[in-house]
Swiss-Prot record:
Disulfides per UniProt: none
Gene Ontology annotations for the cellular component aspect, listed alphabetically: DNA-directed RNA polymerase complex
Stored CDD domains: RNAP_beta'_C, RNAP_beta'_N
A single GO molecular function term of this UniProt record: magnesium ion binding
Xref: InterPro entries: DNA-dir_RpoC_beta_prime, DNA-dir_RpoC_beta_prime_bact, RNA_pol_asu, RNA_pol_N, RNA_pol_Rpb1_1, RNA_pol_Rpb1_3, RNA_pol_Rpb1_3_sf, RNA_pol_Rpb1_4
Reactions listed under catalytic activity: RNA(n) + a ribonucleoside 5'-triphosphate = RNA(n+1) + diphosphate
Record protein name field: DNA-directed RNA polymerase subunit beta'
Cofactor: Mg(2+); Zn(2+)
Cofactor comment: Binds 1 Mg(2+) ion per subunit.
Entry keyword set: DNA-directed RNA polymerase, Magnesium, Metal-binding, Nucleotidyltransferase, Transcription, Transferase, Zinc
GO biological process, alphabetically ordered: DNA-templated transcription
Annotated binding of Zn(2+) 1, by residue: C71, C73, C86, C89
């Protein structure tokens, strides 16, 4: 019977159908129940017989037999004795693999505190006992006593006593009280805790206290105590009395040759613990002196600490070779730990790797696989085929045949491989296109052949790159490889929706060459019947490839019914273009081909083809384009020779002129007219300009040539210079590189980023001298160092992004929200950075879009905007659209398809189950290596020149001012008195064309609503000073302006004019500290004048450093400057660019000198100042005033008495995203992060869709802080998932209770990853110990919602094809949880068919077209 029970128990263990994983503290009884026996001896194995010692660390009796079905002494062997326990050696006869999961235990002679709960900050034991960590450690390591039971004495519970105090107390009170040392003391304290009572006490304290710090502390402790109460963990379990022993096969001892042993460090650590434990037992048995026992107990505590987490306290225990031993904690954390090494990344069988070479003759869906590799990889398939055909009688025979490589084997191999896709992967796999499926073609040789067009996706080249091959084994895997991962289904990039299968290099050059035209080419002006005739004429040498000719071209276009209509015209074109037209698919217009095709044009062409004709046609077209491009690149004979680098004749004159200018500046510097900084900046400007001029002359010379046309007149045409053609077509090289070859190399930077003022005047054709070469090496070396750093940093950013977004999946079709974000074209100054159509393409409209100026609905709500709608938007000149966004999506755990919009890689509305989080992370992380690492230092003069002082309009239109307050001066011009005014120019359709920020004090020549022409200057201001503008006219009266006290007089030596400068408070004498200098405006009678429309007297307080040039009593008109405040041009500002900037944004870091924003709307005034700060007070119309201390050195943008709105900038600087969220809301912070991240990528020319950044922002905004909890399960000030609060609120709304109030919180991506609901996911990311400790104490449950948790427990992920599986399981679970009495309907347990019907996955165009495509490509 017992065996049967055991057998059943073993069976039930393998059941992995669990839905949740819970982690908790193990009680001593639990540990004993896991154990199969106590480990009593530190011995491992007998070194002569190599058999494990009895009761030792490898004991066979406890952990199971060493050999399968054989006891240790050899009495029972074979399967027939299964389950017998040998009476001689006590070993159960069973499989040896039980040694991997049977645990043992050690009974500790005294309790030992678990180091994780002691030292992992915040210390859980310290928090629960409310004692400082230092005190607890002193108790644990036997330095002082702790009072556990004060009795009737005047000692406190938890009080520490030194040795002397203890003896004194003992003399005084005898055994009235109880005090203990070591872990026993702590254990007693923990055991005596009354959690419920404590919780009540804390809640009362929480109500009474007012101090913020105290509240925080109490909340923390309260949460911990409640967690203990709810989870069923007992606090005393944080102190261990029994230690579990890991199964021996997980800490192996392997004999090496030469009689030595390799062992896991854990064995050493366990041996230490057992030795000390046994010694302590002996000492206790002998009743040894206290001091000796104490020392032994301390050593036991230390050795258990080392076993659990070596090095966390004190020095790490080292092994024989001086390196610290690897403890249990080290086994699971870090890159080499269990999580990241074995659970998230495994090695795979049926795989191989080899070098890649070009396969220019392959189809897009094929790759060349060396026969040798194929034979290895497809072995099992070959065996089964050989056997089923009866060619080999047994598997063994088949194996022999394959090893001998008999001819029949190769035939079988070819059969097996046919239409069996394989996966190719190139490391680093930065995005999902780094693994794609191909059909293998068997080839001779040892290198894998790769189709050239997929190189861009893999980022591969053929300079020795290697790729790995994997074989999908099961039918499902093959199906997924074929339908989802085939290279023909990955034409579009998931990051931007543009084609990624785009020709580059040779192909581009070939197409460019064949579509160029030439003046007076051979055969110009001939007429051809059709492209075939033209090709014949070219092949027979009658015409040149570039000759301009007329050809009859037949174009096909689709009508409404989808039939093709033919239309034939005689078209002006060239022979090359006519030949290229022969490969064009039906339905493409000839105009796309009838132009000189550069790289951009070809990309457009493929995109156009995809949108018009679908996937299959585009793939065939791409292949054809590639073959043609290669062929004509070979014919062109384009090569690089030294004579192609033509140096412009004007070069010497330009350089001589520049040298003369530099000499002149040097003269001025020597005579002291300019400063060193100015001289340096001017010299650099001169050389930069000279470089530009040389480059311009060179390009003019290179890019055009003059030919005689048929009439004999000169005509200009684009040059046929090889180097120019390569750069112009986009095949290789750029204008910058040509400039270095044939112009001049120009200015070089030092490693720190500053520019060396002597440029390299030579170019590579002339050659560099030693000094020039030396200067060049600076930049080159810095570039290499940069690249190395960049790769690591970019990889780490991607890892953090993936971790924060990994559990975001499309879980439903429509969440029904009306929320969204408002999209307008991105306009900066006079340039449209991104048009509206590009921003809304592939999004779903959140509210009906009306036709501008009418009530007519143009685009109804919930429409997916595609290219056709975009054209409508352009035609109707729509300017603003509210689209749905991931950030505003209402789905609880996941996102809905409508809020996400189009699946960029497929071109239709996204499917359910798509893992959008991971796609977003990959799309942002993948271009990371292209971003720069540098911080730009901009010198003083360089940035001074960049300061604008006027606005010149580029488009005609109407002016519109936003948040503007102004006065009109006596010339009738407008003077602004508001801070963040925006000036926009609007065209006749009402579309915004330009957008400018105008500062305070700017003089505008046009008012709101005025018309402006092209090139008009509408605003002027002085960039170096900020004026104080008078809003009324009157007479000036000085107030508190006292010479020598608050102001100082200055007289200009040249002009003799005197001015008053207000002194900073810090510089004034004591008497002037409280005076507040101001200018008041009075009328002739001396009465105060009020600012129009208010009851505020017109008086202007002057800040420090303000300069007043007017005298007391002077007359002043409206809009004139009363005083000027010099703006310190801040010296060198570091602009963080590139990768670090992106990381800062996603980590939501506060910038060094953040902008200060107004917390509330109201009137500004200044309170009493302290030593280094001034007090800013904002008084609202009603309610409390808000005070803030601001450092003196910050320049403020507001004057006393000014009205500010909540969220206005009070002091300039970089804005903190946290402030934006708090003061302006979720939309504003989304906008801010999206635009700032895009700014960095745009500079590098990388295109990423906004959606991806929004997905990450959604994950950063996952948490909320409860502001008013009412009677809910939340605590005030607690941080919880927004989804949890929403769910709770829905429930409360139904019950009619008040809703829980909360504020959204922005977390950086690292923080957000660690704060996920899933502890498994967080633990495998970073800070494993801390995460697991926290989770165990709280008894957390992991619902296994995200992708990562499911990968770790070894399941299908709840995304993609695994989505349906998880949905079906959830359904089954719901059915299973229904009460049993009711009759179970026949389809309560859904059949496979039901499930499939439930999730009728919309088969992609890709899947449908696949069979057709494969047949088509074979026939051609």
């Amino acid at each position: 019977m017992k065996d049967l029970v055991k057998f059943l128990k073993a069976q039930s263990k393998s059941n992995d159908d669990f839905d949740v994983i819970k982690i908790g503290l193990a009680s001593p009884d639990k540990i004993r129940s896991w154990s199969f026996g106590e480990v009593k001896k530190p011995e491992t194995i007998n070194y002569r017989t190599f058999k494990p010692e009895r009761d030792g660390l490898f004991c066979a009796r406890i952990f199971g037999p060493v050999k399968d079905y054989e006891c240790l002494c050899g009495k029972y062997k074979r399967l027939k004795h299964r389950g017998v326990i040998c009476e001689k050696c006590g070993v159960e006869v069973t499989q040896t693999k039980v040694r991997r999961d049977r645990m043992g235990h050690i009974e500790l002679a005294c309790p030992v505190a678990h180091i994780w709960f002691l030292k992992s900050l915040p210390s859980r034991i310290g928090l629960i006992l409310d004692m400082p960590l230092r005190d607890i450690e002193r108790v644990l390591y036997f330095e002082s006593y702790v009072v556990t039971e004060p009795g009737m004495t005047d000692l406190e519970k938890n009080q520490l006593l030194t040795e002397e105090q203890y003896l004194e107390a003992e003399e005084r009170w005898g055994d009235e009280f109880d005090a203990k040392m070591g872990a026993e003391g702590i254990q007693v304290l923990l055991r005596d805790m009354d959690l419920e009572h404590q919780c009540e006490v804390m809640r009362e304290e929480l109500q009474e206290t007012n101090s913020e710090t105290k509240r925080k502390k109490i909340t923390k402790r309260l949460k911990l105590l409640e967690a203990f109460q709810q989870s069923g963990n007992k606090p005393e379990w944080m102190v261990m009395t029994v230690l579990p022993v890991l199964p021996p096969d997980l800490r192996p001892l392997v004999p090496l040759d030469g009689g030595r042993f390799a062992t896991s460090d854990l064995n050493d650590l366990y041996r230490r613990v057992i030795n000390r434990n046994n010694r302590l037992k002996r000492l206790l048995g002998l009743v040894a002196p206290d001091i000796i026992v104490r020392n032994e107990k301390r050593m036991l505590q230390e050795s258990v600490d080392a076993l659990l987490d070596n090095g966390r306290r004190g020095r790490a225990i080292t092994g024989s070779n001086k390196r610290p031993l690897k403890s249990l904690a080290d086994m699971i954390k870090g890159k080499q730990g269990r999580f990241r090494q074995n659970l998230l990344g495994k090695r795979v069988d049926y795989s191989g790797r080899s070098v890649i070479t070009v396969g220019p003759y392959l189809h897009l869906h094929q790759c060349g696989l060396p026969k040798k590799m194929a034979l290895e990889l497809f072995r099992p398939f070959i065996y089964s085929k050989l056997e089923s055909r009866g060619i080999a009688s047994t598997i063994k025979a088949a194996k022999k045949m394959v090893e001998r490589e008999e001819p029949i084997v190769w035939d079988i191999l070819a059969e097996v491989i046919r239409e069996h896709p394989i996966l190719l992967n190139r490391a680093p796999t930065l995005h999902r296109l780094g693994i794609q499926a191909f059909e293998p073609l068997l080839i001779e040789g040892k290198a894998i052949q790769l189709h050239p067009l997929v190189c861009a996706a893999f980022n591969a080249d053929f300079d020795g790159d290697q790729m790995a091959v994997h074989v999908p084994l099961t039918l499902e895997a093959q199906l997924e490889a074929r339908a989802l991962m085939m290279s023909t289904n990955n034409v579009l990039s998931p990051a931007s929706g543009d084609p990624i299968i785009v020709p580059s290099q040779d192909v581009v050059l070939g197409l460019y060459y064949m579509t160029r035209d030439k003046v007076n080419g051979k055969g110009e002006g001939m007429y051809f019947l059709d492209p075939r005739e033209a090709e014949k004429a070219y092949r027979t040498g009658q015409v040149e490839l570039h000759a301009r000719v007329k050809v009859r071209i037949t174009e096909y276009s689709k009508n409404e019914a989808g039939e093709f209509l033919a239309e034939t015209n005689l078209v002006d074109t060239t022979i090359g273009r006519a030949i290229l037209w022969m490969i064009a698919p039906k339905g493409m217009p000839f105009s796309v081909f009838n132009q000189t095709l550069g790289k951009k044009a070809i990309s457009k062409l493929i995109n156009e083809s995809y949108r018009r004709l679908g996937l299959k046609e585009s793939v065939v077209l791409a292949d054809q384009i590639m073959y043609t491009g290669f062929a004509y690149a070979a014919r062109s004979g384009v090569s690089v020779g030294i004579d192609d680098m033509v140096i412009p004749a004007q070069k010497n004159d330009i350089i001589t002129a520049a040298e003369a200018e530099v000499a002149e500046i040097q003269e001025q510097f020597n005579s002291g007219l300019v400063t060193a900084g100015e001289r340096y900046n001017k010299v650099i400007d001169i050389w930069a300009a000279a470089n530009e001029r040389v480059a311009k002359a060179m390009m003019e010379n290179l890019s055009t040539e003059e030919m005689l046309n048929r009439e004999g007149n000169p005509e200009k045409q684009a040059s046929f210079n090889s180097i120019f053609m390569m750069a112009d077509s986009g095949a290789r090289g750029s204008a910058v590189q040509i400039r270095q070859l044939a112009g001049m190399r120009g200015l070089m930077a030092r490693p720190d980023g500053s520019i060396i003022e002597t440029p390299i005047t030579a170019n590579f054709r002339e050659g560099l001298n030693v000094l020039q070469y030396f200067i060049s090496t600076h930049g080159a070396r810095k570039g290499l160092a940069d690249t190395a750093l960049k790769t690591a940093n970019s990889g780490y950013l991607t890892r953090r992004l993936v971790d924060v977004a990994q559990d975001l999946v499309i879980t439903e079709d429509d969440c029904g929200t009306h929320e969204g974000i408002v999209m307008t074209p991105l306009i900066e100054g006079g340039d449209v950075k991104e048009a509206l159509r590009d921003r809304v393409l592939g999004r779903v409209v959140a509210e009906d879009v009306l036709k501008p100026g009418t009530e007519q609905i143009l685009i109804p709500r919930n429409t997916l905007i595609d290219e056709k709608w975009c054209d409508v938007i352009d035609v109707e000149s729509v300017d603003v659209i509210k689209v749905r966004s991931v950030v505003t999506c209402n789905t609880d755990f996941g996102v809905c398809a409508k809020c996400y919009g189009r699946d960029l890689a497929r071109g239709h509305l996204i499917n359910q189950g798509e893992a959008v989080g991971v796609i977003a992370a990959q799309s942002i992380g993948e271009p990371g290596t292209q971003l720069t690492m540098r911080t730009f230092h901009i010198g003083g003069a360089a940035s001074a020149a960049a300061k604008e002082s006027s606005i010149q309009v580029k488009n005609a239109g109407t002016i519109k001012l936003a948040n503007a307050k102004f006065v009109t001066n006596k010339e009738g011009k407008i003077v602004l008195t508001s801070r963040n005014t925006e000036l926009t120019v609007i065209d006749i359709f009402g579309r915004t064309k330009e957008n400018y920020k105008v500062p305070y004090g700017a003089v505008l020549s046009k008012n709101d609503g005025a018309e402006v022409g092209v090139g008009e200057i509408v605003a002027n201001w002085d960039p170096h000073t900020m004026p104080v503008i008078s809003e009324v006219s009157g007479r000036i009266q000085f107030s508190d302006i006292v010479d020598g006290l608050t102001v100082a007089r200055q007289t200009d030596d040249l002009t003799g004019l005197s001015s008053i400068v207000v002194q900073d408070v810090g510089e004034r004498a004591t008497a002037g500290k409280d005076l507040r200098p101001a200018l008041r405006l009075v009328d002739a009678k001396g009465n105060d004048i009020f600012i129009p429309g208010t009851d505020v007297a017109a008086q202007y307080f002057l800040p420090g450093k303000a300069i007043v040039t007017l005298d007391d009593g002077a007359e002043i008109a409206v809009g004139e400057a009363l005083a000027r405040i010099p703006q310190e041009s801040v010296g060198t500002k570091d602009i963080t660019g590139g990768l670090p900037r992106v990381a800062d944004l996603f980590e939501a870091r506060k910038p060094k000198e953040a902008a200060i924003l107004a917390e509330i709307s109201g009137i500004v005034s200044f309170g009493k100042e302290t030593k280094g700060k001034r007090r800013l007070v904002i008084t609202p119309a009603e309610g409390e005033a808000f005070e803030e201390m601001i450092p003196k050195w910050r320049q403020l943008n507001v004057f006393e008495g000014e009205m500010v709105q909540r969220g206005d900038i009070i002091s300039d600087g970089a804005e903190t995203p946290h402030d934006i969220l708090r003061l302006r809301g979720v939309h504003a912070v989304t906008d801010y992060i999206v635009n700032e991240v895009q700014e960095v990528y745009r500079l590098q020319g990388v295109k990423i869709n906004d959606k991806h950044i929004e997905v990450i922002v959604r994950q950063m905004l996952r948490k909320a802080v409860i502001t008013n909890a009412y009677d809910s399960e939340f605590l005030e000030g607690e941080q919880v998932e927004v989804a949890r609060v929403k769910i709770a609120n829905r429930k409360r709304a139904e019950e009619g209770k008040p809703l829980v109030e909360f504020e959204r919180e922005l977390l950086g991506i690292t923080k957000a990853s660690l704060a996920t609901e899933s502890f498994i996911s967080a633990a495998s990311f970073q800070e494993t110990t801390r995460v697991l400790t926290e989770a165990a104490v709280a008894g957390k449950r992991d619902e296994l919602r995200g992708l990562k948790e499911n990968v770790i427990v070894g399941r299908l992920i709840p995304a993609g094809t695994g989505f349906a599986y998880h949905q079906a399981r959830a359904k089954k679970r719901v059915v299973a949880e229904q009460p049993f009495e009711m009759p179970v309907s026949k389809n309560a347990f859904a059949t496979e068919a039901d499930i499939e019907a439930e999730f009728e996955f919309v088969a992609d165009e890709a899947t449908q077209n696949l069979a057709a495509l494969l047949n088509a490509t074979d026939e051609e």
